[in-house]
Amino acid sequence: MTDLEVSAIQVIDENKVFNSLLVDYMKQFYSQNNSSDDKGLNYHIVSVFGSQSTGKSTLLNHLFHTKFDVMDESQRQQTTKGIWLAHANHISSSNESGDFANNTKNVFVMDVEGTDGRERGEDQDFERKAALFALSTSEILIINIWEHQVGLYQGANLGLLRTVFEVNLSLFAKNKQRCLLLFVIRDHVGNTSLESLSDVLTLDLQNIWSQLNKPQGTEGFELDDFFDLKFVALAHKLLQPDKFIEDISVLGDKFISEDQLFNEGYHRAIPIDGWSMYAEQVWEQIETNQDLDLPTQQILVARFRCDEISSQVYESFHEQFVKSNWDDLSFTEIGNSLKELRQNAVQQYDILAGRYSESVYLQRKKLLVQKVDLSILEVYTSVLQKLIRQSRDLYLKQIESSLTKKEAGIIFYQVLDNAERESLKYFNENTSLISFVDVDDSEARSYDPSPKLRELEEELSNLRTELVNKEQENIKTKIPRKFKSHFKLIVQDELSNIKPSSWEELLDQFRQVSEKLLAKYKSPDSNYDFHLGLSKEKNKELHEQVLIKFWIKFKEILNDFVTETNVLRLLVSKFEDEFRYDEEGLPVVWKNSAEIDVKFAKARNSALDLLPLFSLAHTAEGEILPDYDIAHDEAEAESDNEEDDGFKESHKFAHLLSARDQDAIRNKFKKQTDALYVETKRSVINSKTEVPLYIYALLLVLGWNEFMIILRNPLLITLLLIGLTGLYLGYKTKLLGPIVQVVQAMIQELQDQAKNKLRDVLVSEPEAPSQVRIGKEVDATKDED
């Protein structure tokens, strides 16, 4: 039997000190035999007590193959001191395979110091405390008595049992915690049947129960409400050794059986890893003579163990959590990793802590989940923020891509709608990948992506508003700019040849260009929709703002074109056209000065008649007025470029030239036209100067020979006839003046070139000697040096 015996550990020594190594002892044997047990409840505690030297330790050693110290029969003295505990690896059995069976139920047995020992004498304090400890921690309480002690009060430990009953009633009255009292009657020789002995003991126990001082509220409780009684008889160990072993085996079969002795109602429901702490706290309460509240002790153990388990689980979770490089993982990998980490932590806690008090277990579980979620939420929130950024970037990228394609019929607000739909779809699809908790999980409300979705929707809404406003400004800038580029040419062409009907024609052209540029925004109901998703009122407001910009651009074009310089140039051009050319567009050949005076006066008056047309833009109905008040908008535009000089009245649309401007133009026009008049007058006077008659006679006398040579020479006469014919044609076509001017210009050019050539020759000739002389002087200077 020695190879099957297991060493014991002292739980409480004779000095009433609890052994802190008990927890390691119990875990050691429990883990060896219950590696697959998750709850830690597959164990049983069996205690034995009785009078000293009655063979309690011997009984346990034979029954459970333990190694408790036994009494030396040569010396009658105390052997078991304090309370000892041992794991029963094997239990005696009568089965055919051997004389023992494996301890699959993890039975731990406690050997309690015997009562009525001479070592303690009258001091019964430890006896009562030990009995109370055994009752508080054990499922089965073995009471070891001799057959001849049945019927005795002290010998059968009935006095101690009375104390046990009273304490049990005070401890377990609320929850009616049950316990099995197993009376093992030793040295039964068979003269008195076991049934008779059982009846005697049962009657004694009931008498003791009836005489108890029951606490208030427990008067109606009976012995059967708290204790189950069973009786076993064992033969004499020395006189009937074989029978004794047989009876031990039969008793062992009862412990092995599923329904003979053990009952779920006896179990204290303390997991094995918390039993040592529970036992220590119970003993501390007993030792300090405090009221022992076992349910409270169980709660305290549950709290301690659940906190300990929670810390261990969180440390394991955190170790795995910090190892993960979340930035390098995809959304699917992040979701799976977070889900696995969270589920593993919760499941591990459920396995280890679910064995304790449900209220404590759930409370600590909630705290653990909150702590785990704090870490996970950092990653979860970070991922959601990353998703928001990516969704926003996708939104802008979709818009840019659609607008860049410039497809026909593209509508701006539809582009925004499509981009928003794709952005939200991207966000929702990826949030579903990282959603790793059920929506019914009350602890998972922090993982609801709805707040972040609303944040994204709000951000997209703000972006949409910003883009729509930007597009409105773009429309108010781009379309008026295009209007200006088109209408500017029309204004230049029309005002360059201004006439009384020009302003009416320009106004018609203004409306035509405006309608043409806005035609694509016009809806069938004659309203305007700029495809920005705006309301009817907003579209109307934008349309008016664009038209205001058109009028402002109209005003800018007029201001740029109708300036003193341009108007003066146009008036002078008009004057020259009428003064230099006739109605057929041919250059005028002046015959006399009177003709110049008439033509000059007519041309100048005709040109000056155009000045009022430039000064005021008006039609037959009156001056042109914008359809909208552009004073405020125009003033804002001008304030960025120039300061108000006190004379500018920007709100007067039709007033282009002030009286001062007109006077300045008239004065400059008068000076330029007067200069032209004088030049023309001088050229006519020069061409009309008369040659004296004697000059002709003198030419005839002196040039008679030359004249005759020409007449006699056919070539010369031919050239003369051609020259005369050309002069005649020039005279008839009134081109003699231009011909003379061209000839004079040619002669002048020939003279200039001749002078330049002569100057070059005269200047270049003396240069060579001077250079030689200078060179010699330089050489002479060098020689002197």
From Swiss-Prot:
- Protein family according to the UniProt entry: Belongs to the TRAFAC class dynamin-like GTPase superfamily. GB1/RHD3 GTPase family. RHD3 subfamily.
Record domain GB1/RHD3-type G: where: 40-266
Any single Gene Ontology cellular-component annotation: endoplasmic reticulum membrane
GO-annotated biological processes: endoplasmic reticulum membrane fusion
Coiled-coil blocks? 451-479
Membrane-crossing residues? 691-711, 715-735
Q: What does this protein do?
A: Cooperates with the reticulon proteins and tubule-shaping DP1 family proteins to generate and maintain the structure of the tubular endoplasmic reticulum network. Has GTPase activity, which is required for its function in ER organization.
Listed GO MF terms: GTP binding; GTPase activity
Q: How does it sit in the membrane?
A: Multi-pass membrane protein
* Protein location: Endoplasmic reticulum membrane
All ranges on the Lumenal side of the membrane:
712-714
The record, for SUPFAM superfamilies, names: P-loop containing nucleoside triphosphate hydrolases
Disulfide links within the chain: none
- Name this polypeptide is given: Protein SEY1
